[in-house]
């Protein structure tokens, strides 16, 4: 009935109105010809409207179909994630990555699921306590058997989840990646994009973070003992209280980073960019900063015992109350008051008859 009523309106009143608009008060053959022409135009318009409506209906159906397919894939992937089989869990992780890649609206949900998975399972021992004496080198895909006590590494499924997080489409993020408290000992984070991530109190001992992007990330009290951060970017990152004992930070960008009370004992910071960084109270005992840029850095109350500053740029650096005993001073840089340079070793020693204590 509705279609019939619409057709009557199109072909009778509307056609008459259009015809009169074309020929005015004419009658007879001229009026009939105008009516036929008007009906033709209305037919064309009606066909276009019908085709447009059909297209919209089909497009809507396709969207719903794809939405249903994505939901099915997501549900199946979640089921796989809860499997007791390692390979099935890893398959579920990569399936979730596919969902996030194909559906921007599901990106944030998938990333939250994966970060929760990492936080929940990363502290479980790997290899399992009841496994043979096999040490898995998960980030290289190799293993070796030895009579030594098992070493602990990141679980392969947790490693897979971290890898997915590290290569996600960050432009779809709604909130920062939260890996606070996660144990990623020995994890492979090479080239990972974790800018702005929260890694508070995470454990990254012996992890490989070569070229990782941690710009603006929160790494307070994180354990980075012996971690490799070569060419990494930690610009404006918060590393307050972090432990970087024996860590490698060659050519690492730490510009404007907060390193307050950070432990950098025996760390290697060759050619690192520490310009405008805050290292108040940091411990750099026996650390190597050869060729590092410390321009404008704040080293107030820092412990710099036997620290190697060879060729380092200390322009405008603040050394208030810093301990400099045995520090290897860069040639040409002014020696702080109360200290003198041992020309044989190139290290700072207390000036004769003085006890300089910390630099003030």
Regions found by a protein language model. Give the residues of each.
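Short hydrophobic membrane-inserting helices
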Residues: 1-52, 142, 168, 358-360
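Transmembrane signal-anchor/signal-peptide helices with a preference for the extracytoplasmic
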Residues: 51-72
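Alpha-solenoid helical repeat architecture
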Residues: 81-82, 118, 150
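Short inter-helical turns and helix N-cap capping residues of alpha-solenoid HEAT/ARM repeat scaffolds
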Residues: 84-85, 103
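Alpha-helix N-cap/helix-start positions at coil->helix boundaries
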Residues: 86-87, 155
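Residue-level signature of the C-terminal ends
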Residues: 99-103, 117, 121, 164-172
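Tandem repeat scaffolds
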Residues: 171-360
């Amino acid at each position: 009935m509705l279609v019939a009523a619409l057709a009557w309106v199109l072909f009778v009143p509307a056609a008459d109105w259009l015809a009169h608009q074309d020929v005015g008060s004419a009658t007879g053959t001229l009026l009939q010809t105008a009516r036929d022409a008007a009906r033709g135009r209305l037919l064309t318009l009606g066909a276009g409207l019908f085709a447009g409506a059909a297209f919209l209906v089909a497009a809507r159906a396709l969207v719903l179909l794809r939405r249903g397919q994505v939901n099915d894939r997501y549900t199946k992937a979640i089921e796989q994630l809860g499997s007791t089989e390692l390979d099935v869990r890893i398959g579920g992780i990569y399936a979730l990555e596919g969902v996030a890649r194909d559906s921007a609206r599901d990106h944030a949900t998938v990333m939250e699921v994966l970060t929760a998975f990492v936080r929940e399972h990363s502290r479980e021992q790997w290899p399992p306590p009841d496994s043979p004496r096999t040490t898995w080198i998960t980030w290289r895909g190799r293993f070796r058997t030895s009579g030594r006590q098992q070493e602990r590494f990141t679980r392969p499924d947790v490693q897979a989840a971290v890898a997915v997080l590290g290569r996600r489409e960050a432009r779809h993020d709604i909130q920062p990646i939260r890996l606070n408290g996660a144990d990623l000992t020995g994890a492979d984070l090479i080239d990972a994009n974790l800018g702005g991530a929260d890694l508070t109190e995470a454990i990254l001992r012996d992890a490989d973070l070569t070229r990782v992007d941690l710009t603006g990330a929160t790494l307070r009290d994180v354990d980075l003992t012996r971690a490799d951060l070569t060419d990494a970017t930690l610009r404006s990152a918060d590393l307050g209280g972090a432990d970087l004992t024996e860590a490698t930070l060659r050519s690492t960008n730490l510009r404007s980073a907060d390193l307050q009370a950070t432990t950098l004992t025996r760390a290697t910071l060759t050619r690192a960019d520490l310009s405008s960084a805050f290292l108040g109270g940091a411990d750099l005992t026996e650390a190597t900063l050869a060729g590092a840029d410390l321009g404008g850095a704040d080293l107030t109350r820092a412990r710099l015992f036997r620290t190697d500053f060879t060729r380092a740029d200390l322009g405008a650096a603040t050394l208030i109350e810093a301990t400099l005993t045995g520090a290897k001073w860069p040639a040409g840089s002014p020696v702080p008051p109360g200290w003198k340079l041992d020309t044989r070793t190139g290290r700072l020693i207390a000036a004769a008859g003085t006890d300089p204590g910390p630099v003030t």
